Amino acid sequence: MTRVKRGNVARKRRKKILKLASGFRGAHSRLFRVANQQVMKALRYAYNDRNKRKRDFRALWIARINASARLEGMTYSKLMGSLKKLNIILNRKSLSQLAIYDKDAFMEILKTIP
């Protein structure tokens, strides 16, 4: 069997991992084996947290809408149910923006609900 020389390939692979690990503390940024484990874990966390961020923002929007609606004596679930019945299509993000930055517009929306 012929000899396979892969010094350049191996060096490039290790450099890539160590570059991704720069900024980690201690051996996690210097030793390849430890750095490789930490990079894999960090990438896994990054992937999971990109999806978690979507859940967190939705929860934040719902909390803001609920707080503003309760000031006017209405719960979040009743508000969303009424909007759906009246075919008022506003997503939670824009509703929460209205609730925070444009109270008058939010109150107008609440007035349309019987």
Swiss-Prot record:
Domain of life from the UniProt record: Eukaryota
Biological process per Gene Ontology, one example term: translation
Key words of the record: Cyanelle, Plastid, Ribonucleoprotein, Ribosomal protein, RNA-binding, rRNA-binding
A GO term from the CC aspect: ribosome
UniProt-annotated location(s): Plastid, Cyanelle
Any GO molecular function: structural constituent of ribosome
Stated role: Binds directly to 23S ribosomal RNA and is necessary for the in vitro assembly process of the 50S ribosomal subunit. It is not involved in the protein synthesizing functions of that subunit.
Similarity field: Belongs to the bacterial ribosomal protein bL20 family.
NCBIfam families for this protein: rplT_bact (TIGR01032)
Protein name: Large ribosomal subunit protein bL20c
Organism of this sequence: Cyanophora paradoxa
Name of the gene encoding the protein in the UniProt record: rpl20
